[in-house]
């Protein structure tokens, strides 16, 4: 992971974000599985994906990008490459990944969070290549972005609103 402009490790901020989001989701009646319960856990992306596939209805990986422009939030979309989108399990799940990503961006945007471009960037990720559940990598800003407790609460509300929308609540 990257390091924020003030020297804070991304893993520290994503763990704080995950705890704030967990509280928001629990308050809305969701069950929440944290793939890691410390600021830095050595699990590769395949292990994280397998854990999520076997124990969850959706997998949301929280990140901040390594750029330095406070560019806003976006999700990593499944590349628009027919040979990639036709492989399993991608073929059976990429549309779910995309719908979840769009819902999260809409939730964030509705809560006043700055969105980068269209809110989507194509990326071939292990996470979406092997997921059998709706799965998304969401970038919540970059190394210049605000990650104060107040900002994390706004981000968590936006993400939770997106999850509600995705699941029809």
Task: Locate the predicted segments by residue.
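Active-site-proximal helix/loop segments of hydrolytic enzymes
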Residues: 8-169
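Short glycine-rich His-centered loop
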Residues: 1-7
């Amino acid at each position: 992971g990257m390091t924020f402009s003030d020297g804070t490790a991304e893993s520290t901020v994503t763990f704080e974000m995950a705890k704030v989001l967990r509280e928001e989701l629990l308050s809305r009646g969701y069950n929440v599985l944290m793939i890691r319960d410390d600021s830095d856990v050595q699990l590769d992306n395949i292990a994280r994906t397998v854990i999520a596939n076997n124990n969850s209805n959706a997998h949301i990986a929280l990140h901040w990008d390594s750029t330095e422009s406070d560019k806003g939030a976006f999700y990593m979309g499944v590349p628009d490459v027919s040979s990639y989108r036709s492989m399993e399990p991608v073929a059976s799940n990429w549309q779910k990944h995309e719908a979840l990503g769009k819902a999260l961006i809409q939730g964030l945007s509705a809560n006043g969070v700055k969105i980068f471009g269209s809110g989507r960037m194509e990326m071939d990720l292990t996470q979406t290549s092997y997921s059998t559940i709706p799965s998304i990598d969401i970038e919540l800003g970059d190394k210049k972005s605000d990650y104060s407790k107040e900002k994390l609460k706004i981000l968590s509300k936006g993400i939770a609103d997106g999850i509600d929308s995705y699941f029809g609540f």
